[in-house]
Amino acid sequence: MNRDGAGEGDSVSHEHSTSKTDEKAKTVPLYKLFAFADSFDVFLMICGSLGAIGNGVCLPLMTLLFGDLIDSFGKNQNNKDIVDVVSKVCLKFVYLGLGRLGAAFLQVACWMITGERQAAKIRSNYLKTILRQDIGFFDVETNTGEVVGRMSGDTVHIQDAMGEKVGKFIQLVSTFVGGFALAFAKGWLLTLVMLTSIPFLAMAGAAMALLVTRASSRGQAAYAKAATVVEQTIGSIRTVASFTGEKQAINSYKKYITSAYKSSIQQGFSTGLGLGVMIYVFFSSYALAIWFGGKMILEKGYTGGSVINVIIIVVAGSMSLGQTSPCVTAFAAGQAAAYKMFETIKRKPLIDAYDVNGKVLGDIRGDIELKDVHFSYPARPDEEIFDGFSLFIPSGATAALVGESGSGKSTVINLIERFYDPKAGEVLIDGINLKEFQLKWIRSKIGLVCQEPVLFSSSIMENIAYGKENATLQEIKVATELANAAKFINNLPQGLDTKVGEHGTQLSGGQKQRIAIARAILKDPRVLLLDEATSALDTESERVVQEALDRVMVNRTTVVVAHRLSTVRNADMIAVIHSGKMVEKGSHSELLKDSVGAYSQLIRCQEINKGHDAKPSDMASGSSFRNSNLNISREGSVISGGTSSFGNSSRHHSLNVLGLFAGLDLGSGSQRVGQEETGTTSQEPLRKVSLTRIAALNKPEIPVLLLGTVVAAINGAIFPLFGILISRVIEAFFKPADQLKKDSRFWAIIFVALGVTSLIVSPSQMYLFAVAGGKLIRRIQSMCFEKAVHMEVSWFDEPENSSGTMGARLSTDAALIRALVGDALSLAVQNAASAASGLIIAFTASWELALIILVMLPLIGINGFLQVKFMKGFSADAKSKYEEASQVANDAVGSIRTVASFCAEEKVMQMYNKQCEGPIKDGVKQGFISGLGFGFSFFILFCVYATSFYAAARLVEDGKTTFIDVFQVFFALTMAAIGISQSSTFAPDSSKAKVAAASIFAIIDRKSKIDSSDETGTVLENVKGDIELRHLSFTYPARPGIQIFRDLCLTIRAGKTVALVGESGSGKSTVISLLQRFYDPDSGQITLDGVELKKLQLKWLRQQMGLVGQEPVLFNDTIRANIAYGKGSEEAATESEIIAAAELANAHKFISSIQQGYDTVVGEKGIQLSGGQKQRVAIARAIVKEPKILLLDEATSALDAESERLVQDALDRVIVNRTTVVVAHRLSTIKNADVIAIVKNGVIAENGTHETLIKIDGGVYASLVQLHMTASN
């Protein structure tokens, strides 16, 4: 909707505010993450927690059994009972394994399922809250890219923090608590001494969590900015391509991902440092325990067995505490990610769409009154739009608001819809303040048709059904008939089920508009608000739609913002608004009586523009200003056929200016229809990506990785070495007193040394792998983005390459790939080193026993493999389903005004929840299977222990090994097993990462059919600007069944102006798309100065052309940067060039009058400027480029008479000596063209000057002009 100059500068303040809060890294208390749990979730969490406690206590219980074993072996090593005694203990191991299977299953399954369910609730609550916010919130605090980023990226962190990681955390803590309880029972004094290390551990852990949270918040903030760059670039790809802005987009994207990379390194280093300190503290405390334990044996009569039991239990308990660090990291990341989402969820909107309080009457009459209204847009509170504005519209009357662009006309509509509340004064309906009504009810009585209708990426039928809950097919059909849309819909292959594409790009402008009107008609409103509702239609459609509107307007209060003569002239009341004041009001004939009044001046303005070809009478009649339109086909200007238009991608509020153009003719079938049916066959299934391929991308970091590998290997060997030390200590404890004293001191020192090693090794390992992983992600993201930006335009017509989906791919997928390289490699090396050193130590101690255990290793291997298999989580299918769900969110947030005005919030939520059902079911299934795999793996492990000790007893019985060697083998292998089991915790990540890698490499490997990064091709020294289209035939790749051009020939001489005229959908804008090589013709050729376009360097070719579309796409940056974009970057254009271009485009004056001038930020999609203002900025952007060829696609259609005159003057100055191709409906523009070409049925039906064509009796042009004349009378 045209915001009438509202709100520049908003995003400026927003940028500052977010960056400040991010610095402080705010988080949510952990328990608050579970705020959305229902009773079933609570049940699951209780079961899961009980399972986790059971699972955790198994380890200390196992150490008790282990104490029994030491006793059994120690006391019976020389007698025949050893096998009997030991086998009894072994049986207990098997029972414990069974118990652990059940507990582990409950732990994993319950927590994974509840995590999936609650994350889904948070996502859906977040979207629900976003939809209920007042429109001002979207102007100031958020944008589509951020919402989609939070829903796809941040919820992954939140789910991570509330799913199986919680179970794991409870398990580890209960191991710790259970262990210490048993240790106190066995030997309290020694346990107390060992406990002294706990405060140090806690401090290290807390410091680490703090640092990690800080870094991760900073990283998320940088990624959110990068996501916005992706959203803006992909969403406006035609503009980016036309202005060769790819490089600029890539650079700003790289800037943000580099700052995210820096945060990730800090995060890695902090984690490593924390771990290193923890392990150092552990080892020092063991040193203390060994020295002190020796003392206890000598002085307090402890036995060696009990000392070892206490040490082992405390080791096991404390180690489990150390393993909580990934959980703590995940909690910290989840808490940081949840902060922004929960803040939003808690936010109470100023105008609440879900508020059920307020009056609900039987019906309303429809008297509308604005009483002494003071208003400024929230994004620019200092700039008053209205300062005491009043207006009364009696029920059933039609009131027309006219005035220049930016005067506040659309603001009236915004206030009546209650998108905003006035600062002072009131807006009344039937004498009751709007604030007193129930918002949903009063909005249901108001129908809105904007100048730039917003459609959702679903079918035509679903789009119309937004107008009314539970509408029947019959009602929908009647509404399409009334809106004159039934005919073109029936011509589409899928009829009402045709998909309209992202933002309706599959339809031409007029088609979109008629669907929007049908949607409003279905609502059967008492008050109808038409914001330029017919401006986008060609004469023929306009006549029929206007008749439809006339039928619909009967007995309804109607407020029209328009420039069209016919609409305004018959209005009961016309109000002329200037700079937020009503300067005149009355009927058409009353206002004309004052020959120096504002209205008469507007009309005169129009006459000059119009040329003098129309009869003065109609001129006068002229309402506001569109009468001059030869509106020949505005309807679609669009591009006829594909998604064309440049703007289209702009999407939402762009004012489109006239809305429309974006679409294409749908002459038949939505562009993507063919594919939808077949299930988008166009996309081949993703090829698997080999790990070597990803590793190759990490090549530059080989030195870092090698060093990291060495460090990780040292780190991995630490625990098995620890095993030798413990078995040596056991031995020492059974030695004579003086030897015991000496040995205990010696081994204590060795332990401290081991701790110091860990202190150096751990942070180095984390840091080195963070550098390698971070650089890899950054490289993959920039390669992928760079590749995507250079794809041919038709690639973006595919739904799977929409801006929302691409944003999710770049943020989520790239981060997952890192798990394959950095973290996973680091862990794999560490675990391999643990395993290898464990085996070596075991074999040296007792090769027979080690061999027996080794034979059983495959069992452990199989169980590890099963775990990996079971954890194949979040399969590709679920991933793309969530992508589809985020597209629903993307659409709704981008079109929040439409959603609000149709009270469609619940409908959007239903669509969103429907898209999420599948992935949630998959998550539940996956949780169930993972739980089984996880439990089973523990059972196998315990069976292996039981078998090993039984075999050991046999060997001891036969005298083949000694009791100390048995334990050395056991400790070395246990420690190795702990290493191996840790690596399986990375299983879920690697499978997700492979799917992610495939989706990213699918983009990197694709060859662009029209590659703007390709530097080859001819560059002409001197461009004259002769263009020739020879025998073109063309269909849009996404709709191969619809022929746009059959055999089109057209010659455009250098320096001349050619106007293309024709009905909506005839292919006029397609000519412009082909000239810029957004698409290539199927046959025939286009030449520039005799050279075929395909032979010219693409980037150079696009630099020779300046495009001004009817729906200009501006970026969320300053006005200066938007104009300089024409040169390719802000640095390339000097201040004087920018100002000169703005003056030429008649934009300098309005820019200078805004507080921040050229530094004003235009807002997402330029929403802070009115239509006419945006258009002038776009013209300045094209002028700065100094193009040889100018392409004007309805460039002035969105302007009021005054701006149009000025812009038209500017364009007249600019087109001198330039080859110009104009798609237009204004008689004046077309009439003065050197050649007018009529496009019809895929060929040029007539061409010549206005004078020659008008004389052809029964000619297409002559009849169009005739139709126009009668329409204006």
Swiss-Prot record:
<feature type="transmembrane region" description="Helical">
    <location>
        <begin position="42"/>
        <end position="62"/>
    </location>
</feature>
<feature type="transmembrane region" description="Helical">
    <location>
        <begin position="169"/>
        <end position="189"/>
    </location>
</feature>
<feature type="transmembrane region" description="Helical">
    <location>
        <begin position="301"/>
        <end position="321"/>
    </location>
</feature>
<dbReference type="InterPro" id="IPR017871">
    <property type="entry name" value="ABC_transporter-like_CS"/>
</dbReference>
<feature type="transmembrane region" description="Helical">
    <location>
        <begin position="840"/>
        <end position="860"/>
    </location>
</feature>
<feature type="transmembrane region" description="Helical">
    <location>
        <begin position="927"/>
        <end position="947"/>
    </location>
</feature>
<feature type="transmembrane region" description="Helical">
    <location>
        <begin position="961"/>
        <end position="981"/>
    </location>
</feature>
<feature type="transmembrane region" description="Helical">
    <location>
        <begin position="93"/>
        <end position="113"/>
    </location>
</feature>
<feature type="transmembrane region" description="Helical">
    <location>
        <begin position="746"/>
        <end position="766"/>
    </location>
</feature>
<dbReference type="GO" id="GO:0005576">
    <property type="term" value="C:extracellular region"/>
</dbReference>
<dbReference type="Pfam" id="PF00664">
    <property type="entry name" value="ABC_membrane"/>
</dbReference>
<dbReference type="InterPro" id="IPR027417">
    <property type="entry name" value="P-loop_NTPase"/>
</dbReference>
<keyword id="KW-1133">Transmembrane helix</keyword>
<feature type="domain" description="ABC transporter 2">
    <location>
        <begin position="1027"/>
        <end position="1266"/>
    </location>
</feature>
<protein>
    <recommendedName>
        <fullName>ABC transporter B family member 12</fullName>
    </recommendedName>
</protein>
<feature type="transmembrane region" description="Helical">
    <location>
        <begin position="706"/>
        <end position="726"/>
    </location>
</feature>
<feature type="domain" description="ABC transmembrane type-1 2">
    <location>
        <begin position="705"/>
        <end position="992"/>
    </location>
</feature>
<feature type="domain" description="ABC transmembrane type-1 1">
    <location>
        <begin position="45"/>
        <end position="333"/>
    </location>
</feature>
<feature type="binding site">
    <location>
        <begin position="1062"/>
        <end position="1069"/>
    </location>
    <ligand>
        <name>ATP 2</name>
    </ligand>
</feature>
<feature type="glycosylation site" description="N-linked (GlcNAc...) asparagine">
    <location>
        <position position="1247"/>
    </location>
</feature>
<dbReference type="Pfam" id="PF00005">
    <property type="entry name" value="ABC_tran"/>
</dbReference>
<feature type="glycosylation site" description="N-linked (GlcNAc...) asparagine">
    <location>
        <position position="648"/>
    </location>
</feature>
<feature type="transmembrane region" description="Helical">
    <location>
        <begin position="192"/>
        <end position="212"/>
    </location>
</feature>
<keyword id="KW-0067">ATP-binding</keyword>
<dbReference type="GO" id="GO:0016020">
    <property type="term" value="C:membrane"/>
</dbReference>
<dbReference type="GO" id="GO:0005524">
    <property type="term" value="F:ATP binding"/>
</dbReference>
<feature type="glycosylation site" description="N-linked (GlcNAc...) asparagine">
    <location>
        <position position="470"/>
    </location>
</feature>
<dbReference type="InterPro" id="IPR003439">
    <property type="entry name" value="ABC_transporter-like_ATP-bd"/>
</dbReference>
<comment type="similarity">
    <text>Belongs to the ABC transporter superfamily. ABCB family. Multidrug resistance exporter (TC 3.A.1.201) subfamily.</text>
</comment>
<keyword id="KW-0677">Repeat</keyword>
<feature type="binding site">
    <location>
        <begin position="403"/>
        <end position="410"/>
    </location>
    <ligand>
        <name>ATP 1</name>
    </ligand>
</feature>
<dbReference type="GO" id="GO:0140359">
    <property type="term" value="F:ABC-type transporter activity"/>
</dbReference>
<feature type="region of interest" description="Disordered">
    <location>
        <begin position="1"/>
        <end position="20"/>
    </location>
</feature>
<dbReference type="GO" id="GO:0016887">
    <property type="term" value="F:ATP hydrolysis activity"/>
</dbReference>
<feature type="glycosylation site" description="N-linked (GlcNAc...) asparagine">
    <location>
        <position position="801"/>
    </location>
</feature>
<keyword id="KW-0325">Glycoprotein</keyword>
<feature type="transmembrane region" description="Helical">
    <location>
        <begin position="272"/>
        <end position="292"/>
    </location>
</feature>
<keyword id="KW-0812">Transmembrane</keyword>
<dbReference type="InterPro" id="IPR003593">
    <property type="entry name" value="AAA+_ATPase"/>
</dbReference>
<keyword id="KW-0472">Membrane</keyword>
<feature type="glycosylation site" description="N-linked (GlcNAc...) asparagine">
    <location>
        <position position="631"/>
    </location>
</feature>
<keyword id="KW-0813">Transport</keyword>
